[in-house]
Regions:
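N-terminal helix-turn-helix
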Residues: 8-44
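Short, cationic-aromatic polyanion-contact patches
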Residues: 12, 46-58
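Amphipathic helical "hinge" segments at domain boundaries
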Residues: 54-121, 214-221
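Periplasmic-binding protein-like
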Residues: 60, 118-126, 144, 193-197, ...
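Flexible loop/hinge segments that line or gate small-molecule binding clefts
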Residues: 127-176, 277-290
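Hydrophobic alpha-helical segments within soluble ligand-binding/sensing domains
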Residues: 158-194, 237-242, 293-314
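An alpha-beta-alpha
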Residues: 178-218, 315-332
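Flexible loop/turn connectors
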Residues: 242-338
Length: 338
């Protein structure tokens, strides 16, 4: 078929069948197969044409709001990088759909979602989108959810993940917590403090996982825990460090906020520090006493596209683990290189 010029009108069935030496019934079956593969298209009242090109499959990435790409954190940008790379290499299109104009799940722009259907391949990152999951089910989309491990099951998430068209990639935070505490111990530190965002949230698995790791690696030690607020106020951050780290005679601190990283670098340059969930060495101003965890979101994004396009039952539910890096061994890595 590809020996014919794209856009060419094929002969009428009776003539084409004679030319090919087959019956008209056989020809009709063959044309039906070619049409299903987008190699020909039938135009009622005109005939059958050779297609100009085979339509690419489309990957749809849902975003909370139109500005999410500009505002997004490193992990989302790296995830998108992997998705774009996969779409380019696997010859499919990528579209992004903003769910809400105001970044509010109760203010959904439904008209942006109405084109989703049984042929749609949809990527979802995080639990923010759960209120539209029933809509995605009703639309019969094929969905892949990338999400972090939680302390408790999130509502009826398990029911969604049992559906045959739903896939998920889980980020193992328990493993991350254990690896970070173990790395701290192997580096010679024995009295950590944890000043991290979200430690007071009930469904956050990290407080439980971090305490379990400390109980196993540092039996008898009860580390200070403080659920840090997102702030750039240096005096507030210093006050928290003095209270929970310095006065408690801690020899290492774990953080997950960039503002704490900056303040520690300026005011406590000799304080060993573990940074959770860091995805790029770019703008990471560590020293030889710093280490960090990183999930390979470029790889995760790439494999998410592969799963939607070609995945099978055996790969529907996957668990990803992080790696731990010392800043002193990673500082020569080029920006953006993973």
């Amino acid at each position: 078929m590809r020996q014919l010029v794209p856009g060419k009108l094929l002969p009428k069935e009776e003539i084409f069948a004679v030319n090919l030496g087959v019956s008209r019934d056989t020809l009709r079956k063959a044309l039906a197969i070619l049409e299903a593969e987008h190699l020909v298209r039938r135009v009622k009242g005109h005939g059958t044409y050779v297609t100009d090109a085979i339509p690419k499959r489309k990957i749809t990435l849902l975003l909370p709001c139109p500005d999410e790409i500009c505002m997004g954190s490193y992990h989302l940008l790296h995830y998108l990088h992997g998705i774009q790379d996969a779409c380019c290499k696997l010859q499919c299109e990528l579209e992004t759909l903003a769910v809400s104009p105001t970044n509010n799940i109760d203010d959904i722009d439904w008209k942006n979602l109405f084109n989703l259907n049984k042929d749609s391949l949809v990527l979802v990152y995080g639990y923010w989108f759960m209120k539209i999951f029933p809509f995605l089910v009703a639309s019969r989309c094929k969905v892949l959810l990338t999400h972090e491990q939680l302390r408790y099951d999130k509502y009826d998430l398990k029911d969604y993940l049992k559906l045959p068209d739903w896939n998920d990639f889980l980020l193992n935070r328990e493993d991350e917590a254990y690896k970070m505490v173990r790395h701290m111990y192997e580096s010679g530190y024995r009295r950590p403090a944890f000043l991290m965002e979200y430690l007071n949230e009930d469904d956050n698995i990290m407080p439980v996982a971090l305490r379990a790791a400390c109980d196993k690696i540092l039996p008898g030690y009860k580390p200070p825990f403080y659920s840090a607020e997102r702030t750039t106020n240096e005096s507030t951050i210093i006050k928290n460090i003095e209270k929970y780290v310095i006065k408690e005679n801690c020899d290492c601190v774990f953080i997950n906020l960039g503002s704490y990283q900056d303040v520690i670098q300026r005011n406590y340059p000799d304080l060993p520090c573990g940074f959770f969930h860091r995805n790029s060495i770019k703008e990471f101003h560590g020293n030889h006493k710093w280490f960090y965890s990183r999930f390979d979101f470029v790889k995760i994004g790439y494999q998410a596209v592969e799963q939607l396009l070609h995945g099978n039952e055996a790969t529907r539910h996957r668990v990803f683990q992080c790696n731990i890096y010392d800043y002193q061994t990673e500082k020569n890595r080029k920006d953006g290189e993973l």
